[in-house]
Curated annotation (Swiss-Prot):
Reaction equations catalysed: ATP + H2O = ADP + phosphate + H(+)
Name of protein: ATP-dependent rRNA helicase spb4
Segments of skewed composition (Basic and acidic residues): 527-536, 577-628
Main function: ATP-binding RNA helicase involved in the biogenesis of 60S ribosomal subunits. Binds 90S pre-ribosomal particles and dissociates from pre-60S ribosomal particles after processing of 27SB pre-rRNA. Required for the normal formation of 18S rRNA through the processing of pre-rRNAs at sites A0, A1 and A2, and the normal formation of 25S and 5.8S rRNAs through the processing of pre-rRNAs at sites C1 and C2.
Residue ranges, annotated region (Disordered): 527-642
Amino acid sequence: MAPKPPPGTSARAWDGVTPALSEWVLDAVASMGFTRMTPVQASAIPLFMAHKDVVVEAVTGSGKTLSFLIPVVEKLLRLEEPLKKHHVGAIIISPTRELASQIYNVLTSLLAFHPPSASTLKPSDDDDDAPRQKFPSSTLKVVPQLLLGGSTTPAEDLSTFLKRSPNLLVSTPGRLLELLSSPHVHCPQSSFEMLVMDEADRLLDLGFKDTLQNILRRLPKQRRTGLFSASVSEAVDQIVRVGLRNPVKVMVKVKGTSGVQDKRTPASLQMTYLTAPPTHKFPAIKHILYSLEPAPQKTIMFVSTCSGVDYLSAILPSIIGDDFQLIPLHGKHQANVREKNFNRFVNSHTPAILLTTDVASRGLDIPSVDVVIQIDPPSDPKTFIHRCGRAGRAGRKGLSVVLLHPGREEDYVSFLEVRKTPVAPYPHTLTITDADAAAATETARKAVLADRALHDRGQKAFVSWFRSYSKHQASSIFRVADLDWEGLGNAWGLLKLPKMPELRNFQGDRTLGVNLDWENYAYKDKQREKRRKEQVQENAENGVADDQAAGKKRSSESVAWSRNLDNRNKKLKRREAKQARQQKDKWEKMTEEERQKVLETEKMLEQIRVKNEEERLLRRAAKDKESKAAGGDDDDEFKGFD
């Protein structure tokens, strides 16, 4: 048994909590390596154990999980008598399968130090034949059950519940509501003690508001409720007003280097940004991964879409190299694939990269993440701190890098600073040449040329990426009009730009300089290639129809330029009118608080835009002055960063 931390007078000593923690809990936290409580634990645990409703807002990686698990377990083990069969004493709700699984794993690690509760846990395969200690039915114990949609059916969950009669449920919202709807599951006021909603704002962001309200209606009002999150939004406040009784609000912040307590991320996390043209992004990522000392063992890279994960997971390994194992993870993966890939990353003993969407940005307690790289800044700025917070957890040093395009996107730095999430320039010298960028593009295209299916995947991913980019909440910073289409296409290793309405007036090279025999460009999958050839043959046999179609196309192309321009202007006006109507409808449906928030955001963005435009003009004037003094103009070559 691990030695308990020595008694002390520190307000964060585990043995100084009032009411006092059980001896076995002190053994458990000591074994887990926690010599003293984190600030959020020191604030929340005594309150929750003292029968207070709590709303806890704290930075990611601050130890929120134990802040609610310990009070819940202590409460269930201090009842006067065991709960009746099929009566539930406590529920923990999580927004995602992965987070629910992690909470359950921490819970079972904790209960392993309480022999009566440990005896109820499902034995591992290695211990199936080992004798298990039995305890009288009158012994108080915690019997947990994990409920996850996609892993088991509701009928199987109910069968397990009836067989084991758990008194603590850890679940995602939908599967929990299904179980609570059964007449065999009981949560009366005489039995039910505590409800925990972890990552509460994410629960609402994912559309679980109605489900949560249905769950709350099935639970007694006389209960203790804990709401834990990295940020508390107006929507969360609505849940607080409905579901909590006179809650105590706990807000734990960390000091920045200036000593001002306004940072929303861990002090041990170094948050940086890197400005690079599209074609330089992937070579820059490779340079970061190979130049850091010590080399990162676990890296998370965020992109904006699921199809982006699917495509980039196929081309990035050839660019980054074999020293890093790249593992994809997104919300559209089958449940078993998500679980398998997540465990591969967590349990990897070699350098690994998790290429993922925002499914991994919240709540997941992935141990020992060294670096977070945001290839795409998140559409919702609130998500930024949650992505960064995957590194630098529990006091561990971490590095976060967000990649930005030169120009207007650099205003994102000021935008983040206003939101109390400051980022600094990437501190290490990094030089990427155009030759490096061209080599990365060539490497990616080589992979795409090997299989037409990868080309199809890339076209879909690029369109999906653009749609996500166009919906960015800070649209005055992330402007579609400023995008370098050819640079983006080359960076992604595309063989041509996809057909999409936004490129209708594009005057550049849609082929991206690639000369390809498309008729003989084949799929690796033989059956798919066979079907493609049959379609090509069918088109050839219907050549007359094709000629007629081509004639119609030529006819449309021969329309007078002025008429085409007039048609385009009419379409543009119709589109603008439609967008204006949609904006008006959206505005009318907003509450007064939501309208005020939108106005404040727009005002803030305009102030940032004006400020940065003034600074940009001053820098340009100074640069022109230096250039003239030197007797020539600077070339456009990318020279890296200091």
